[in-house]
């Protein structure tokens, strides 16, 4: 009788151990699957955010590229004649703050201010340029210190003549770069060696990542810019 009781107790103990192990394995598998699913979902949201920002900015810059054929011939005209077409083109391109005509390195006509006589290098040290140039900078004329995105199209071999289109990127920042907490903690636009950070303006270096963060970057296939998105790392 005692032997039978020991067998029953041994069986119950083994069954309890097996059930406990099965429960622990099930819990671990459930948590692992949930963690992987959550990580994949976060990565998907990060990629979708970056794709949306790149596509949106591509859509802003493409009309400028197409419209340069309208603007470049205006360089042959005096400002008194070219000013009205400049204003109309700026109004048509709703994201453009202003358009300027540059002749021999001198900004001589602006869609906002009309006739001017200012060396373009005084306003933007990187201009004029021999080739097409996209650059991040700050406004030195209208809303001083505010972020701007400049698209430059040269019209002469030496780059001294050209068209400067200024995109009001400050107004687009909320649409493009506003973080979506908690999956996305920060986002930035990089053009050349400068970066536009949401809430911080134009800076020369991206902030260092925290130890529990990682950064995803996506570059445009059509224009020289990159969107960077930061958020919790996969291990968090």
Language model features with spans:
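Short, Lys/Arg-rich, polar N-terminal cytosolic tail immediately upstream
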Residues: 1-9
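Extracytoplasmic/periplasmic sensory segments of membrane signal-transduction proteins
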Residues: 60-118
């Amino acid at each position: 009788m005692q032997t039978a009781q020991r067998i029953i107790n041994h069986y119950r103990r083994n069954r309890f151990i097996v059930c406990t192990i099965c429960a622990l394995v099930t819990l671990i598998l459930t948590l692992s699957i949930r963690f992987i699913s959550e990580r994949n979902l976060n990565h998907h949201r990060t990629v979708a955010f970056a794709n949306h920002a790149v596509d949106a900015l591509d859509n802003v810059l493409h009309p400028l590229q197409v419209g340069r054929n309208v603007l470049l011939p205006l360089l042959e005209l005096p400002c008194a004649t070219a000013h009205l077409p400049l204003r109309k083109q700026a109004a048509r391109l709703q994201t453009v703050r202003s358009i300027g005509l540059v002749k021999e390195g001198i900004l001589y006509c602006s869609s906002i201010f009309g006739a001017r006589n200012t060396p373009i290098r005084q306003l933007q040290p990187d201009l004029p340029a021999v080739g097409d140039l996209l650059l991040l900078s700050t406004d030195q004329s209208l809303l001083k210190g505010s972020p701007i995105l400049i698209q430059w199209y040269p019209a002469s071999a030496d780059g001294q003549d050209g068209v400067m289109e200024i995109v009001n990127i400050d107004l687009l920042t909320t649409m493009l770069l506003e973080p979506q907490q908690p999956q996305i903690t920060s986002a930035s636009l990089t053009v050349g060696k400068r970066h536009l950070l949401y809430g911080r303006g134009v800076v020369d270096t991206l902030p260092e990542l925290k130890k529990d963060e990682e950064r995803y970057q996506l570059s445009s296939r059509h224009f020289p810019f990159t969107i960077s998105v930061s958020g919790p790392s996969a291990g968090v």
